[in-house]
């Protein structure tokens, strides 16, 4: 049996003639090979990145982030303009948040969506206008809500009856009237991983359709709260607008019923727009998705003879995902017999599930390329794994890499701009890597990496006077 037809190889993965191509739909648009076969991103060599900042290393292409932010805003603005309404595009900060990224997306005209006190403080530290922040979360604490009202946050997406009462009391004490949206479970089952689907009934977020109507009625009774719209988020890594259209129909039904109680200026359809992680992933263009969503809302409003509200959306992954790569150095390489006389090469790198939890958490597929050189070697079925003491520490489950990959080579995994840094951990006492932004041939740290000393400093059993000897990896 050939490897290309074995159980070791996903149905979508085929053996290439050579394993050097950087697939355009997966990599940042600035990524390319230079004369010696190595890769540059944002005009910066992977060798320079390694030498200055070490590995593993998160690399984020600033121009790519900005371009995707502009594209998302333009897509929804154009779709909304066709129907004489406005679009409000919020960057979903949970995908990747730092002060610099907040500044980039705000520069490009986006508002920002946060879901914890920490994310709120990052956005504020970046200089974001609180009035252009939205606050999500199924279990916001009293202190989180106090802080949100204190700074004048634009909107709070309420998620439970308890939160409504809690927020109303806080706003009343402060003499404020807080704008709120009500998060709704529309019952739409998104075509995605179970942990990424968020609008079906049996999960922690939001109100049922019936419960949402009761929540709105209660909010309208409270003088310290202002109901401004409904919100629904059907999931993440979704490739077309069909699920959004179905969700929109149910939202508009509820919206129409609620109009009897007063004007409702906004309908927020959430985010979750997918990107390509491998060469076979084929998400619809954001322009097509935006048009499908907004047109669906327009159609549903027309059927019911009601005015169309403004539309809000919350893209995250589609803004930063393709803009990021993670750079690793190969440590060991070994080939094992995986059954039926089939071999698999295990390529171990100096990172792993501590810097990319998505394969372990969601079974997510990624791709990888040798980026320190090209190779004429026959591609070999490979699995890229990390250095952690865990069998599930898999970075790329199945990939064809050159058969001559060797210790010291540099590998890069593309499309790691979203939910890699955000989900990073210190598993096995591993310091989290720095994040470096590249643009126009220059690289700069936007999030400092951790050192062993940083981790040891949290251990209360170590005397404060103990010497420290381990430097940060991001020395510039």
Spans of model-derived segments:
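A charged N-terminal "starter" segment
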Residues: 1-178, 222, 226, 441-476
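Active-site loop/helix belt of alpha/beta enzymes
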Residues: 2-22, 81, 186-337, 401, ...
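General structural feature for long, well-ordered alpha-helical segments within catalytic domains
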Residues: 45, 61-64, 68, 72, ...
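Conserved, mostly hydrophobic/aromatic
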Residues: 65, 94, 116, 148, ...
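Active-site beta-loop-alpha junctions enriched in small/polar residues
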Residues: 92-98, 117-118, 138-140, 159-161, ...
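Short acidic, glycine/serine/threonine-rich loops at helix termini
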Residues: 101-102, 125-126, 145-150, 167-170, ...
């Amino acid at each position: 049996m050939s490897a290309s037809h074995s159980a070791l190889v996903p149905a979508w993965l085929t053996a290439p003639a050579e394993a050097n191509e950087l697939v355009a739909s997966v990599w940042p648009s600035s990524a390319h090979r230079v004369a010696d076969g190595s890769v540059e991103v944002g005009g910066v060599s992977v060798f320079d990145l390694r030498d200055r900042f070490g590995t593993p290393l998160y690399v984020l292409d600033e121009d790519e982030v900005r371009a995707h932010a502009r594209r998302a805003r333009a897509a929804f603005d154009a779709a909304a303009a066709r129907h004489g309404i406005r679009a409000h595009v919020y960057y979903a900060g949970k995908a990747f948040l730092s002060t610099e990224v907040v500044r980039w997306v705000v520069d490009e005209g986006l508002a920002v969506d946060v879901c914890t006190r920490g994310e709120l403080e990052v956005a504020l530290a970046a200089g974001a206008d609180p009035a252009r922040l939205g606050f999500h979360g199924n279990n916001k604490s009293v202190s989180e809500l106090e802080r949100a009202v204190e700074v004048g946050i634009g909107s709070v997406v309420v998620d439970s009856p308890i939160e409504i009462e809690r927020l109303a009391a806080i706003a009343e004490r402060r003499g404020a009237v807080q704008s709120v949206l009500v998060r709704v479970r529309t019952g739409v089952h998104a075509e995605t991983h179970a942990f990424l689907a968020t609008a079906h009934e049996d999960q922690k977020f939001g109100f049922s359709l019936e419960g949402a109507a009761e929540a709105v009625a209660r909010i309208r009774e409270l003088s310290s709260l202002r109901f401004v719209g409904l919100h629904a988020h059907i999931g993440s890594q979704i490739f077309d607008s069909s699920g959004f259209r179905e969700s929109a129909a149910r939202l508009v039904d509820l919206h129409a019923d609620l109009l009897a109680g007063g004007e409702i200026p906004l309908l927020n359809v959430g985010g979750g727009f997918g990107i390509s992680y491998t060469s076979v992933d084929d998400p619809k263009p954001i322009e097509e998705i935006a048009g499908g969503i907004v047109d669906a809302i327009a159609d549903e409003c027309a059927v019911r003879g009601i005015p169309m509200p403004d539309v809000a959306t919350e893209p995250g992954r589609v803004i930063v995902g393709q803009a990021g790569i993670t750079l690793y150095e190969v440590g060991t390489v070994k080939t094992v017999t995986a059954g039926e006389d089939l071999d698999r090469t295990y390529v171990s790198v100096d990172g792993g599930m501590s810097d990319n939890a998505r394969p372990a958490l969601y079974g997510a597929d990624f791709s990888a390329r040798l980026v320190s050189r090209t190779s004429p070697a026959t591609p070999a079925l490979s699995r890229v794994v990390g250095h952690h003491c865990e069998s599930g520490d898999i970075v790329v489950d199945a990939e064809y890499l050159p058969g001559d990959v060797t210790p010291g080579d540099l590998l890069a995994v593309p499309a790691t701009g979203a939910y890699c840094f955000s989900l990073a951990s210190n598993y096995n006492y591993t310091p989290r890597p720095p994040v470096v932004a590249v643009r126009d041939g220059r690289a700069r740290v936007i999030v400092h990496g951790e050192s062993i000393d940083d981790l040891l400093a949290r251990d209360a059993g170590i005397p404060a006077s103990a010497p420290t000897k381990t430097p940060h990896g991001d020395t510039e």
